[in-house]
């Protein structure tokens, strides 16, 4: 298994020790104990932390259920694309924002891309993984997001591009958001989170536990509802 070294994300020595042990394949009893202390019963789980799952079906079910509980009509934002179908499909598979983004006021969301340079448009600063809620809609219908630190950001569509030899071969455009109630471990790669709820009892791929755990900045932000040995391999 190949692991990217992303130690800059964490600021917790004990947590770094656990992650290093998983990465090097030298997980010991003390590392299991460290993680076992983060096992949390349902009543103790934070309401606003995203849930990480191994399987898409769990993610889709939780996001759809949470959105349905909110009052009001959902607004839909459809992805647009340019270029050859096969190239566009590849971009869409790698894009964290869905082809059709459904939002309601009050929905928990996560940014799926880093913000453009400060000079670009009206968007505030955000990174891939910034959490917030839909606070309302701009005059042109674009979602206004209130982030966890109180920043209000009016979102606009952004592009994901496939370039070859300096030329753009295909591109997709979508608002850089997704519902943040749940996501797959795979889709969380590259994100940096303050907290996440994760069930690693069903981890089925080598490295999956490492990817999930290393999304979170510190051990106190990890909420485990299940863990199997495979997750730490």
Labelled PLM ranges:
Residues 107-233:
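C-terminal accessory regions
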Residues 1-127, 135:
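Conserved helicase motor core of P-loop NTPases
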């Amino acid at each position: 298994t190949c692991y990217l070294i992303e130690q800059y994300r964490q600021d917790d020595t004990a947590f770094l020790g656990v992650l290093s042990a998983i990465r090097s394949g030298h997980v010991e009893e003390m590392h299991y104990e460290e993680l076992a202390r983060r096992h949390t019963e349902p009543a103790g789980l934070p309401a606003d932390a995203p849930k990480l799952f191994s399987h898409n079906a769990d993610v889709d079910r939780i996001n759809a259920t949470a959105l349905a509980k909110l009052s009001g009509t959902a607004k839909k934002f459809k992805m647009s694309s340019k270029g050859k179908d096969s190239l566009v499909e590849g971009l869409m598979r790698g894009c964290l924002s869905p082809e059709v983004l459904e939002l309601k006021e009050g929905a928990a969301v996560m940014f799926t891309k880093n913000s453009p340079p400060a000079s670009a448009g009206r968007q505030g600063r955000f990174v891939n993984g910034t959490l917030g809620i839909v606070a309302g809609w701009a005059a042109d219908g674009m979602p206004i997001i209130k982030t966890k630190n109180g920043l209000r950001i009016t979102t606009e569509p952004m592009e994901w591009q496939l370039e070859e030899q300096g030329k753009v071969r295909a591109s997709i455009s979508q608002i850089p958001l997704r519902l943040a109630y749940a996501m797959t471990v795979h889709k969380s790669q590259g994100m940096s989170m303050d907290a996440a709820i994760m069930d690693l009892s069903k981890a089925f791929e080598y490295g999956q536990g490492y990817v999930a755990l290393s999304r979170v900045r510190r051990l106190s932000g990890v909420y485990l509802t299940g863990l199997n040995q495979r997750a730490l391999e």
